[in-house]
């Protein structure tokens, strides 16, 4: 066991050979490396599997022994300065290592097929492997200096992957936006680290917390300064985990390839901010005002992320705002001091959201064959719909991830979110009401995504691309709700909708696809791969198709995680049955924070609390089903809903409220616009003023001196040309000047 911990230093360096070898291969043997590019997926996956096995072994030792291991090497520069590097192995390290490696392996397998036709395949795997190295180095760091180094490397990999398709201006701008926004938080983190070193003289986690607690207990430190240092450290987590007000970079980060959204922007990198707060929680917990601030930022982010997600049309940006909201729940739990619950939700959310992102990638992958490689179309949920029959496996996986995020038992996020809601009532009833309301809102926007994508009809074939109002059978509002259009008796597109029944693929069902749209076209629409155009020419009529097996494999494994990973944190005990493996793993850290690791509830209390949270989730699902139901839904036959819908359409106040909510959500809460006006525009004006001052004043003075010298030189050059007339003129001029001065002063 001791040897296992001593060998843990290899964890962050195991995936490193892949990007090095890819770089050397492209430099020395570019043709051979590119021809064998698919080969590089195997070592990337294999090396990460080794790290995963090592991490699981460490976790088993942690559960059995409940101890913390730290190994440090000191590099003495002189008698007054020495640098210490090492690694820290505790429960938090084990959890994060398993999370990074498991999700990373599945994303690498998924990416091998998803990125197979991309010219940047090798570059993608090099970036991804280097990101895994950086993230593993971050979670195993034993001091704040190492944390900051790997923190910046993680950010660099994120920027490279966000701007992976750098030839697209939108992706390049998103990369710059992520960089600038995170610079704010990272600068605060650096200042906080320097401030702590100035106070304590140490940056090692094993010494830092004890020194700070002693200084605070003995009143030997300025409480305002130590609070400022804590706030600056927290700024780094706010930016990295996309918390308000530094959240604006995360939705734009979806411009990168979808697999990296599953790994970086759902499971690992954005969780780095949560990890840092969890690592420094013994320090934060000594300053109650900082804990309250963490909880306050968390609850604001919870609400903001949920409200901004309810009207987005881009499926990935919808999931990005969902990630932002769920990270807010984790930050809220840490602010309340619920260390175990925050990490529990970090685990359950990582697998559920990775499943949703990979599912969205499968959907986008199938849509690209129809609408082209344009994110505005392939990721637009308004052009989807009716995908259940075309991508049934993806649909099932996406539904499971959706139910998990909504908090429906027995899926993973139900167990963790339910505990956060319960603890919020003990912390603050106001925060609890907001958190519970947002849980219902989460169910609403997640089922909105599901209904728009998988239910109804395939809207690409009915969407109006030409701007003509009468060219579609169905109109789709900005909210994504379908509404029937009245068809004229004479329809000139019937021949385009007539399908050939000879060449039908096995993926498609035999029943009519768009039956009963209208009596005039009731029997003419069926789903086939080819159609006859005016009876003479065949042209392909594409429909979405299921993804390849390698992509589906990763999704199915994540489905299993979403089903069963919640069992590790079940905290209720009955008749000696203890299922809370997570508390056993976290027992060293929980003892450090003076929390009771034996906290549990009985079955009755559990079912009482769960019934309330599940009822909220089902209410949100019901509202989403009402507003985004397909046009053929049997809910339309209910007199109560018809009556409500009729009254709602006549209510001007309700329309005003709904439109206001939509404008708020679709325009990102006007926060980006506010930053554009108050910060970006101001910086640009200042830059223009600085440019004017630099060119006209700083450069103007030496330029003026140079021009003046040039003119004087030219004048003397003309006078000294050798002409007698020039000399006489010059002599007369100075004689007259002398006489004028003489008579002015002396006479």
Swiss-Prot record:
Superkingdom as given in the UniProt entry: Eukaryota
GO molecular function: NADH dehydrogenase (ubiquinone) activity; quinone binding
One GO biological process term: ATP synthesis coupled electron transport
Recorded catalytic activity of this chain's protein: a plastoquinone + NADH + (n+1) H(+)(in) = a plastoquinol + NAD(+) + n H(+)(out); a plastoquinone + NADPH + (n+1) H(+)(in) = a plastoquinol + NADP(+) + n H(+)(out)
Transmembrane regions listed in the UniProt entry: 9-29, 40-60, 89-109, 125-145, 147-167, 185-205, 219-239, 258-278, 280-300, 327-347, 354-374, 396-416, 425-445, 552-572, 606-626, 727-747
Main localisation: plastid
Localization annotation: Plastid, Chloroplast thylakoid membrane
Topology in membrane: Multi-pass membrane protein
Pfam families registered for this protein in UniProt: Proton_antipo_C, Proton_antipo_M, Proton_antipo_N
Keywords: Chloroplast, Membrane, NAD, NADP, Plastid, Plastoquinone, Quinone, Thylakoid, Translocase, Transmembrane, Transmembrane helix, Transport
GO cellular component, one term: chloroplast thylakoid membrane
Catalytic activity, EC: 7.1.1.-
Functional summary from the UniProt entry: NDH shuttles electrons from NAD(P)H:plastoquinone, via FMN and iron-sulfur (Fe-S) centers, to quinones in the photosynthetic chain and possibly in a chloroplast respiratory chain. The immediate electron acceptor for the enzyme in this species is believed to be plastoquinone. Couples the redox reaction to proton translocation, and thus conserves the redox energy in a proton gradient.
UniProt similarity note: Belongs to the complex I subunit 5 family.
Description of how the protein assembles with itself and partners: NDH is composed of at least 16 different subunits, 5 of which are encoded in the nucleus.
Name of the featured protein: NAD(P)H-quinone oxidoreductase subunit 5, chloroplastic
Gene name linked to the record: ndhF
């Amino acid at each position: 066991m001791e040897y296992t911990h001593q060998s843990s230093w290899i964890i962050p360096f195991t995936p490193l050979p892949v990007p090095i070898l890819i770089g050397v291969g492209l430099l020395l043997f570019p043709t051979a490396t590119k021809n064998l590019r698919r080969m590089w997926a195997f070592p990337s996956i294999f090396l990460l599997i080794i790290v995963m096995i090592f991490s699981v072994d460490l976790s088993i030792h942690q559960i059995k022994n409940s101890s913390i291991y730290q190994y440090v090497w000191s590099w003495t520069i002189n008698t007054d300065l020495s640098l210490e590097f090492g690694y820290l192995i505790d429960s938090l390290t084990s959890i994060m290592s398993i999370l990074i490696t498991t999700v990373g392996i599945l994303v690498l397998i998924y990416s091998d097929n998803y990125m197979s036709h991309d010219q940047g395949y090798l570059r993608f795997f090099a970036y991804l492997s280097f990101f895994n190295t950086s993230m593993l180095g971050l979670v195993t760091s034993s001091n704040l200096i190492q944390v900051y180094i790997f923190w910046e490397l993680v950010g660099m990999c994120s920027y490279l992957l966000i701007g992976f398709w750098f030839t697209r201006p939108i992706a390049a701008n998103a990369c710059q936006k992520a960089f600038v926004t995170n610079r704010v938080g990272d600068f605060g983190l650096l200042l906080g680290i320097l401030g702590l070193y100035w106070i304590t003289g140490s940056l090692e986690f094993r010494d830092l917390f004890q020194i700070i607690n002693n200084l605070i207990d003995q009143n030997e430190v300025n409480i305002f300064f130590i609070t400022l240092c804590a706030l600056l450290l927290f700024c780094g987590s706010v930016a990295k985990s996309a918390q308000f007000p530094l959240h604006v970079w995360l939705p734009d980060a979806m411009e990168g390839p979808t697999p990296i959204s599953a790994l970086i922007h759902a499971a690992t990198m954005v969780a780095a901010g949560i990890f840092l707060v969890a690592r420094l929680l013994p320090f934060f917990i000594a300053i109650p005002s900082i804990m309250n601030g963490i909880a306050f930022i968390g609850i604001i982010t919870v609400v903001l992320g949920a409200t901004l997600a309810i009207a987005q049309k881009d499926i990935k940006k919808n999931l990005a705002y969902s990630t932002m909201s769920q990270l807010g729940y984790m930050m809220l739990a840490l602010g309340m001091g619920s260390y175990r619950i925050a990490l529990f939700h970090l685990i359950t959310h990582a697998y559920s959201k990775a499943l949703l992102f990979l599912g969205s990638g499968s959907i986008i992958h199938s849509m690209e064959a129809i609408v082209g490689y344009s994110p505005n179309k392939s990721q637009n949920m308004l052009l989807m719909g009716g995908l259940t029959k075309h991508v049934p496996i993806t649909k099932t996986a996406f539904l499971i991830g959706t139910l998990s995020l909504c908090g429906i038992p027995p899926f993973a996020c139900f167990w963790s979110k339910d505990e956060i809601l319960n603890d919020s009532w003990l912390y603050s009833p106001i925060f609890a009401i907001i958190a519970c309301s947002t849980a219902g809102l989460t169910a609403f926007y997640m089922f909105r995504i599901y209904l728009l994508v998988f239910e109804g009809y395939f809207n690409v074939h009915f969407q109006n691309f030409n701007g003509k109002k009468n060219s579609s059978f169905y109109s789709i509002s900005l909210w994504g709700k379908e509404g029937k259009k009245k068809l004229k008796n004479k329809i000139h597109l019937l021949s385009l909708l007539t399908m050939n029944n000879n060449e039908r693929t096995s993926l498609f069902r035999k029943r009519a696809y768009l039956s009963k749209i209208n009596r005039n076209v009731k029997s003419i629409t069926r789903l086939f791969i080819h159609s006859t155009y005016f009876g003479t020419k065949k042209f392909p009529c594409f429909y979405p198709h299921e993804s390849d097996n390698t992509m589906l494999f990763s999704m199915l494994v994540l489905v299993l995680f979403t089903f069963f990973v919640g069992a590790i944190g079940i905290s209720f005990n009955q008749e000696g049955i203890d299922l809370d493996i997570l508390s056993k793993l976290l027992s060293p850290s929980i003892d450090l924070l003076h929390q009771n690791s034996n906290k549990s509830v009985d079955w009755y209390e559990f079912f009482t609390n769960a019934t309330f949270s599940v009822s909220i989730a089902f209410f949100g699902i019901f509202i989403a089903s009402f507003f985004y139901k397909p046009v053929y839904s049997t809910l339309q036959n209910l007199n109560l809903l018809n009556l409500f819908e009729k009254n709602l359409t006549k209510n001007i106040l309700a329309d005003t409220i709904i439109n206001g909510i939509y404008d708020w959500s679709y325009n990102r809460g006007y926060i980006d616009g506010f930053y554009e006006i108050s910060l970006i525009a101001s910086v640009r004006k200042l830059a223009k003023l600085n440019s004017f001052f630099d060119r006209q004043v700083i450069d103007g003075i030496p330029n003026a001196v140079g021009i003046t010298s040039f003119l004087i030189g030219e004048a003397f050059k003309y006078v000294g040309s050798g002409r007698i007339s020039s000399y006489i003129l010059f002599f007369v001029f100075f004689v007259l000047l002398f006489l004028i001065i003489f008579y002015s002063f002396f006479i």
